[in-house]
């Protein structure tokens, strides 16, 4: 094994690319230069040029998998800091997230159906707006294709992270709570990360949106599909 295939080297390359991409977006302010999108694109080119397989590259990923769970738990910190506001606005928060879940599932399912997608594809697209682990479990329970769901979830997150705040600016939605909840619910972890870059307040509401939408989607997607006659 040459040094290019060393798991620590590949991990360092990943961190380095992401750090530079983060700096680039911060300097330019261009949302299209999303650090996650840039990192993925550059890594694909790097792996192709060096003829390193994905399996070899992914060995380095096992070194940091442990930190995924603590990172999710850490999302509770900004939530706690906004606890009083959340308590006061609990009903509109819950209703908006419920509505967002229902509209999100129905819209993608109907569009896919109108375009002639098979039931298997529809089941794979239905949980598009929640984090990958939840989305894949929902897809498995429905009989969809988990790997397709994972790819769709990443694409949805990137689009939400790039276009989310721009879209809300055009519609004159200025409330940090509304923006954070919307982005967390629609663009899950990527949207939450983008919100955290703005402020802890935005990040707190995005974390809440991500969590509530994940719960509602897991619970309601099978029922929605049955009501639409697709399950």
List each model region and its residues:
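Alpha-helical membrane segments and immediately flanking helix-loop junctions
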Residues: 121-148, 154-155, 167-170, 174-212
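Juxtamembrane boundary at the C-terminal end of a transmembrane helix
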Residues: 113, 220-231
């Amino acid at each position: 094994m040459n040094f290019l295939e060393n798991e620590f080297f590949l991990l360092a390359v990943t961190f380095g690319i992401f750090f530079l991409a983060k700096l680039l977006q911060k300097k330019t302010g261009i949302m299209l230069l999303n650090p996650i999108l840039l990192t993925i694109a550059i890594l694909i080119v790097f792996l192709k040029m060096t003829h390193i397989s994905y399996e070899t590259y992914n060995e380095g990923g096992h070194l940091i998998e442990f930190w995924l769970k603590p990172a999710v738990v850490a999302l509770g910190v900004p939530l706690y800091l906004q606890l009083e506001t959340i308590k006061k606005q609990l009903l509109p928060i819950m209703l908006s997230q419920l509505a967002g879940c229902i509209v999100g599932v129905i819209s993608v399912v109907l569009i896919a159906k109108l375009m002639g997608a098979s039931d298997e594809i529809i089941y794979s697209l239905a949980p598009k707006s929640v984090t990958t682990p939840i989305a894949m479990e929902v897809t498995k329970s429905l009989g969809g294709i988990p790997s397709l769901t994972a790819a769709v979830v990443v694409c949805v997150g990137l689009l939400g992270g790039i276009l989310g705040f721009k879209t809300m600016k055009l519609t004159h939605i200025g409330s940090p709570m509304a923006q954070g909840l919307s982005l967390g619910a629609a663009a899950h972890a990527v949207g939450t990360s983008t919100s955290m870059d703005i402020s802890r307040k935005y990040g707190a509401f995005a974390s809440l949106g991500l969590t509530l939408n994940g719960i509602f989607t897991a619970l309601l997607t099978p029922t929605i599909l049955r009501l639409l006659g697709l399950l």
